[in-house]
């Protein structure tokens, strides 16, 4: 009987020891998990802070000389552009030209679009005016008019813009090109989705043509 009681006591002691070990292991795991969570949150906040600081202090893009002219020509297109006046800015910056702002400060797409020329009223009235209001011009008049026009230095830069564009397109223009390509891709996908499932035949079937011929005869 004494041996059985001793064995029972020893088994109960072992069970208590195992319970103590389990509780100790759980108590040590909880602070470890909390420390890992704190480290993870700190790393995320540090990454967000570094990304924001990089965006805030990143170097601004500048354009000068031929690259500025090529970019203006690409952005404005057929409208043309001017260098001195700027209708979209405040009076403080109205005296500055596009060269001073884009070459020495910073240049973005919105600033370039403000220097695009607007179509004049005369060009708009030509499309609505009747044909009799415009007198016909002879070939000699056209030749003399073309001969007397003077080309400025900006026109010469525009003619030579193809050679300068080979050096690379600025990031502002690349972003606009990518946006236009994405719009074209979306339009093509919508056209494919809205395509009709069935198309009606243009010509009549053969049996209808054969039946219509003897009726005419």
Swiss-Prot record:
Q: Which biological process, per GO, is one annotated for this protein?
A: positive regulation of vascular endothelial cell proliferation
The record's keywords, sorted A to Z, are: Developmental protein, Differentiation, Disulfide bond, Growth factor, Neurogenesis, Secreted, Signal
> GO molecular function terms here?
growth factor activity; hormone activity; insulin-like growth factor receptor binding; integrin binding; protein serine/threonine kinase activator activity
Which parts of this chain are annotated as the region C? 84-96
Please report any disulfide bonds recorded for this protein chain, giving both cysteine positions.
64-103, 76-116, 102-107
According to UniProt, residues marked as the site described as Important for interaction with integrin are 79, 89, 92-93
The signal sequence is: 1-56
Location of this chain's protein in the cell: Secreted
The ranges of region (D) come to: 118-123
Proregion residues are 124-217
According to its UniProt record, which protein family does this protein belong to? Belongs to the insulin family.
The task this protein performs is described as:
The insulin-like growth factors, isolated from plasma, are structurally and functionally related to insulin but have a much higher growth-promoting activity. Promotes anterior neural development. Acts as a ligand for integrin which is required for IGF2 signaling.
**UniProt-recorded name of the protein:** Insulin-like growth factor 2.L
List the source organism: Xenopus laevis (African clawed frog)
Gene that encodes the chain: igf2.L
């Amino acid at each position: 009987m004494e041996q059985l009681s001793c064995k029972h006591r020893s088994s109960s002691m072992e069970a208590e020891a195992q319970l103590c070990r389990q509780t100790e292991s759980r108590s040590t795991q909880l602070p470890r998990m909390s420390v890992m969570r704190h480290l993870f949150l700190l790393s995320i906040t540090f990454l967000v802070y570094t990304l924001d600081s990089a965006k805030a202090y990143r170097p601004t893009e500048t354009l000068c000389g031929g690259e500025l002219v090529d970019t203006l020509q690409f952005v404005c297109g057929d409208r043309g552009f001017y260098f001195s006046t700027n209708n979209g800015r405040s009076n403080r910056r109205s005296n500055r030209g596009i060269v001073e702002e884009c070459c020495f400060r910073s240049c973005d797409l919105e600033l370039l679009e403000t220097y695009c020329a607007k179509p004049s009223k005369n060009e708009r009235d030509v499309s609505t005016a009747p044909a009799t209001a415009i007198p016909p011009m002879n070939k000699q008049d056209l030749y003399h008019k073309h001969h007397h026009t003077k080309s400025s230095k900006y026109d010469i830069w525009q003619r030579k813009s193809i050679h300068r564009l080979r050096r690379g397109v600025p990031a502002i223009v690349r972003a606009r090109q990518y946006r236009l390509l994405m719009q074209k891709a979306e339009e093509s996908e919508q056209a494919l989705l809205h395509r009709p499932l069935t198309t009606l035949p243009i010509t009549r079937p053969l049996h209808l043509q054969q039946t219509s011929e003897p009726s005419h005869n």
